[in-house]
């Protein structure tokens, strides 16, 4: 029987849902994106796909040749695959959303508060863990990871080098004034310690300070070593940016594009950029996750599919699983297949939202009035009705339906947040208050054409540059609903359609042209470090963290007020969270469009499939699943 739609969600607000708890932010192109090159017709199975113990996952998010971490790319599908390839983090989040030391990895740990207000985390690694090539994993690999990813050498090849940002001695090490990282110590072959700055404490997610993901020093810097001294740990031997350009950045053999030695549940086998297909193979050396669970599916293939044809691909057997499916028409097509017994499905609420993301460093979207005016030009209720088909709700701030904070705040949200109901007159009032009162000739605005404003003695037009995802139903719907009202308010919307890789380079300010707005989706991580996502500190101004490039005193203060709240103080956290989303709702670095119900549709041969959004994504669910 077809699942009943969440029609009550469309009444402008919300209904309570089962609680789910909720790092850098995941970035996806509003859930649906460009079609693949379609190497296999939907009516024909792809070659070699008669193999039984493999899982083909269809994704609508374009993949990049990036398999290192979110600091190089926070693209949605790559973001999830990192956890399949890499592993043995000392601190993990459980299936219940709690943080703990991973007993598969950690033999013992100790936290000591120092007299100067700093805190030292000492962690001993279990014997017997090995890299996929059989090389033993030791504390050196963990210390190397911190030194590598905090180093000026890594920064020179395009990595932000922020891993050790919160640790004592980071500034001196990153600036190159010392080769020793004072807050990082190699205690013995299996033990390391890190000391957190007093200024970073207390922290809501303080256990995470003890967490490190190892990196294979023998691959990335084979002629280097990690040594310890009273001044802190350091890297000796050959370790230069020129070396890292080869071992990390080489597009064919570097660790970013081709990580051949890993310690996660799966090995990186291949990635075909043109076919948009990644192949992962089971890692026989993997010791298991925090529960000791190891995968049984031999091969995982991740393949780009089109939102228009992906249900046909699933029905034909060209893919086995479609994860995080959204959009009313697509969901209905999947539920029809379920009614026919062709597929099984599960659903869960989203820990994130679809959005228009603003770049707040660019004129004229550096003005909150302009951002709010654009919001007033869009009928978001109608947008949600058309796009989600009853499986979603309008969001009004930085939250998703799955968050417990949202579920405990439904009435409060409806009473306290601006819903930005479509009102072109309100948009005009905001623009006039912001100084957009002139025409092209410098005379008072006549009510026709584009508004102008005098800035530093020059007339500037009210032109918004939109980087839109290609072949994207969200972008298509926005293109039918937004331009006319913006024009009526005196704004000009210029649309440039592009693939996700090009779009992402603009978001990260690594391309020649930076746009004012993008249609995207965001996943809110379990470790929801809002104080970094909206920090004024330039170190966090980057894709994956403060991707809005917003430097606002009130928003920064509201986010940082949450940092020191103890992890178990839910009442104080909730009150501060409400204050934060209220300030966010006023500053509006994004226009939240919708948060919705995600569906996973899969072939009945896929057994024990149990995923949720941020807490237990498909990269975790794969470990429990089997092919039967």
Place the predicted regions along the sequence by residue.
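Short, low-complexity disordered leader/linker segments with a strong preference
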Residues: 1-52, 115, 438-456, 626-628
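N-terminal lobe/hinge region of extracytoplasmic solute-binding protein
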Residues: 55-116
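Gly/Pro-rich hinge or "lid" segments in bacterial periplasmic/extracellular proteins
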Residues: 95-96, 210-292, 299, 429
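Aromatic- and charge-enriched surface segment that lines or borders ligand/interaction sites
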Residues: 107-163, 187, 193, 313, ...
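Surface-exposed binding/hinge segments that line
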Residues: 159-243
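Ligand-site clamp/hinge motif
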Residues: 252-257, 285-333, 483, 492
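Append "and occasionally in soluble cytosolic enzymes with long acidic Gly/Pro-rich linkers
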Residues: 281, 366-483, 579
């Amino acid at each position: 029987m077809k699942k009943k739609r969440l029609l009550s969600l469309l009444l402008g607000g919300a209904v309570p849902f089962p609680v789910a708890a909720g790092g850098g932010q995941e970035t996806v192109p509003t859930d649906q994106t460009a079609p693949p090159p379609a190497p296999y017709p939907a009516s024909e199975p792809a070659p070699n796909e008669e193999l039984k113990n493999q899982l083909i996952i269809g994704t609508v998010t374009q993949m990049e040749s990036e398999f290192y971490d979110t600091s190089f790319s926070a693209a949605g599908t790559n973001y999830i695959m990192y956890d399949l390839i890499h592993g043995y983090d000392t601190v993990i989040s459980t299936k219940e959303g709690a943080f703990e030391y991973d007993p598969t990895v950690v033999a013992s740990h100790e936290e000591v508060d120092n007299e100067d207000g700093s805190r030292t985390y000492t962690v001993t690694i279990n014997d017997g863990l090995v890299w996929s090539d059989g090389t033993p994993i030791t504390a050196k690999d963990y210390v190397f990871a911190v030194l590598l990813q905090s180093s000026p050498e890594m920064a020179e090849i395009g990595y932000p080098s922020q891993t050790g940002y919160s640790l004592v001695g980071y500034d001196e090490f990153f600036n190159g004034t010392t080769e020793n990282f004072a807050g990082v110590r190699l205690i013995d072959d299996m033990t390391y310690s890190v000391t957190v700055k007093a200024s970073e404490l207390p922290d809501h997610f303080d256990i995470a300070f003890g967490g490190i993901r190892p990196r294979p020093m023998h691959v990335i810097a084979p002629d280097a070593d990690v040594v310890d001294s009273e001044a802190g740990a350091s890297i000796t031997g050959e370790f230069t940016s020129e070396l890292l350009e080869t071992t990390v950045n080489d597009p064919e053999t570097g660790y970013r594009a081709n990580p051949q030695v890993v310690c996660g549940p799966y090995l990186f086998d291949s990635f075909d950029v043109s076919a948009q297909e990644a192949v992962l193979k089971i890692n026989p050396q993997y010791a298991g996750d925090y529960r000791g669970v190891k995968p049984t599916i031999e091969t995982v293939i991740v393949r780009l599919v089109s939102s228009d044809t992906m249900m046909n691909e699933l029905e034909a057997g060209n893919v086995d699983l479609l994860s995080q499916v959204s959009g009313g028409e697509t969901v209905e097509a999947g539920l029809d297949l379920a009614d026919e017994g062709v597929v099984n499905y599960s659903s869960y609420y989203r820990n994130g939202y679809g959005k228009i993301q603003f770049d707040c460093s660019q004129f004229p979207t550096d003005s909150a009035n302009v951002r709010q005016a654009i919001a007033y030009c869009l009928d978001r209720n109608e947008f949600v009705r058309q796009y989600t088909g009853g499986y979603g709700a309008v969001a009004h701030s930085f939250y998703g339906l799955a968050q417990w904070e949202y579920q405990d705040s439904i009435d409060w949200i409806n009473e306290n947040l601006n819903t930005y109901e479509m009102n072109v007159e309100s948009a005009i009032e905001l623009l006039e208050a912001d100084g957009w009162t002139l025409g092209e000739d410098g005379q008072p605005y006549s009510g026709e054409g584009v508004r102008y404003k005098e800035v530093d003695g020059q007339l500037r037009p009210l032109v918004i540059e939109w980087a839109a995802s290609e072949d994207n139903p969200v972008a298509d719907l926005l293109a039918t609903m937004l331009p006319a009202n913006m024009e009526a308010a005196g704004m000009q919307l210029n649309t440039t359609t592009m693939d996700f890789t090009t779009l992402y380079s603009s978001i990260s300010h690594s391309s020649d042209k930076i746009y004012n707005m993008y249609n995207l989706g965001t996943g809110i991580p379990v470790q929801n470090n809002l104080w970094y996502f909206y920090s004024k500190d330039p170190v966090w101004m980057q894709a994956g963290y403060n991707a809005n490039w917003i430097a606002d005193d009130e928003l920064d203060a509201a986010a940082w007020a949450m940092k020191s709240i103890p992890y178990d103080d839910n009442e104080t956290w909730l009150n501060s969270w409400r204050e934060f989303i209220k300030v966010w709702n006023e500053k509006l670095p994004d226009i939240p469009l919708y948060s919705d119900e995600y569906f996973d549709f899969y072939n009945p041969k896929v057994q024990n499939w149990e995923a949720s959004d941020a807490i237990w994504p498909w990269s975790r669910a794969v470990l429990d699943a089997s092919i039967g």
